[in-house]
Amino acid sequence: MRAIGIRSTPKGGFGNRLLNYINLRELSSLFGVPWFGPNVGDRRLVRGIHRPRRWPEALLQPVFFDREEILEEEFLERASDVLSNRRSVIMKPRLLTEALARFDFLPPRQLVRHRFSICGSHRRQHGKEAPIVLHLRGTDFATWQPGAVLEESFYRNALDLLAEQGLQDAAVRICTDDPEHPALEGLSMDLRRTGRLLEGPCDNPFQCDFAAMAQAQTVVSSPSTFAITAALVGHSSAIHSRKWIDSRIQKGDLFWRKIRNRTLRGHRLFAEV
């Protein structure tokens, strides 16, 4: 049985899970074989994440690949050999940015389409959504990677750059999962003072924030997979931290190198600041 898939749901939030699905769809399309994976609720939020078929292991005759093997240069050739022998490929489930950098054969928005929409409260309050969204990611990021919680100066520099492009009066929305983010208070105060901040109660922050980032003209982005995937399946361009990209490239991170070089399919880099 020729197929490719994962056995268990990956750890982490929605962005991590969506990256796994995108990578599965990329490889399924490349090899022309069905994909399979755990049946989770994300399929109600994203078109293309359908209920995967389930086959008995005896029929699959699987060959297992761990994360290190998936990232090796020889992986695609080895996987092709397995599939040509009518066996299946089963991968460890953390197929995140490093895998997408290797398997971005098609733009993600060709493979999946999100069903997220701006909540009713925001539509009633503001009528239209902000062209600029700031994504502030905090919480566990402080312990995940030094420098991953971006400084307030990054967001201010990005807003200054957008002002030079004629967006000095454009409305701004702040999306964050962390009310204690060190940049939140200062940014909110200044944007509120100038009448640019879109704020108010939200019916469903998770879905509404994702929709806002996917629909925005520009997202001033954290390194979060939640923000990155919104840009990949949406229509926004992104401003990223030059300091963050430098640090990741120094560690050999192909994903961020491709973002800098504007060679990651489906990603639109507006600028680094």
Regions found by a protein language model. Name each.
Residues 18-28, 155-163:
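Histidine-anchored nucleotide/phosphate-binding helix
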Residues 5-6, 34-40, 133-135, 173-175, ...:
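A structural signal for short, well-ordered beta-strand segments and their strand-loop junctions
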Residues 1-11:
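Nucleotide-activated donor-dependent transferases that construct or modify glycoconjugates
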Residues 9-19, 143:
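A short, glycine/small-residue-rich beta-strand->loop->alpha-helix junction that serves as a flexible
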Residues 167-258:
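Donor-binding and catalytic core of enzymes assembling or modifying cell-surface/extracellular glycoconjugates
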